[in-house]
Amino acid sequence: MINIKIGKNQYPLTLAEDHNFDWLKEVEVFTVFDQQDSGNISFGIIENGKRYFLKYAGARNLEYKGKVKDAIQRLMKAKEVYEQIQHPLLVSYINPIQMQNGFCLRFHWMDGECMHNHWDFTPFEKHHAPNSPFVKLRQLSVKERLNILTQIFEFAAYVESLGYVMVDFYDGSILYNFEQSKLTICDIDFFQKNPVFNKVGEDFWGAGRFKVPEEYELHAQITSETNVYVLAGIAFAFIGGKNDKSYEKWESTLELYNMCKKALHKEKNKRYRTVQAFYEDWLAYIGEIGGSFSQRINSISINRGENTK
């Protein structure tokens, strides 16, 4: 275990091995996220009066057990994902930074609280501590939580329209600013273009509480049906009984409950076949149809000044 200081303000950082962070010496570091099993270490910095989020691979944190070079390669692949997927809900990507001993992605800083803040809250505290972001989320009105879910599902449908599968998407990918009622998707590093296959078996990326049967199965294809399952699991976490999938714990309508139960079917061919179909049914059931799926997708593309190909 190595304790070092980084940034011009000498912010403390603990590593498994020593590493040179001189490239941060001219900026102020105001927070560090160093408990990621992906091998990344992330920083909140202030440079020229502006806040940025840096995601860095190249140093060994205390949680990562793999090879540092593999973490670097994964983050380099993630660069392409952030370049190709741009959405109003997604944390705003700026540019890559190649270091002598590592690789970094830079983003605009987004204020918000993570729905799976495991570095500050134990699993018990996550569900019971008054200041836990997840507890605060569950205290919002059902209408507010349905609105959050609708935004998440719209983002997922857009990602699908670009030919991507959302690998390792879970509540830790979700930030919420309670003061501004603003949702941010913060982590899409492992999203992949179709086709995607499980090459590692039960250790496939993903949070156990949301993982799908095929995410434990070696050589299984990871598809839109997989993503539908994960999205329904998030719905049960936000407005249901979490692991208890009974209707008694569900806080919304029977129609939405039945829809999410269908999405959680263990057999892929009995789920919704696409995120688009799941999302459109969701919109229909909550009475928020303000345009077809294609119109919503096109509006995002127009705002970006791009097409969806």
What are these regions (language model features)?
Residues 251-266:
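Conserved C-terminal C-lobe helix
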Residues 173-188:
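Conserved protein kinase catalytic/activation segment
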Residues 200-215:
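Conserved activation segment of eukaryotic-like protein kinases, specifically the C-terminal portion
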Residues 148-149:
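Activation segment signature within eukaryotic-like protein kinase domains
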Residues 30-32, 38-81:
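ATP-binding glycine-rich loop module of kinase domains
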Residues 1-31:
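Juxta-kinase regulatory segment immediately upstream of eukaryotic protein kinase catalytic domains
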Residues 156, 160-177:
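Catalytic-loop of the protein kinase fold
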Residues 92-140:
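Conserved structural core of kinase catalytic domains
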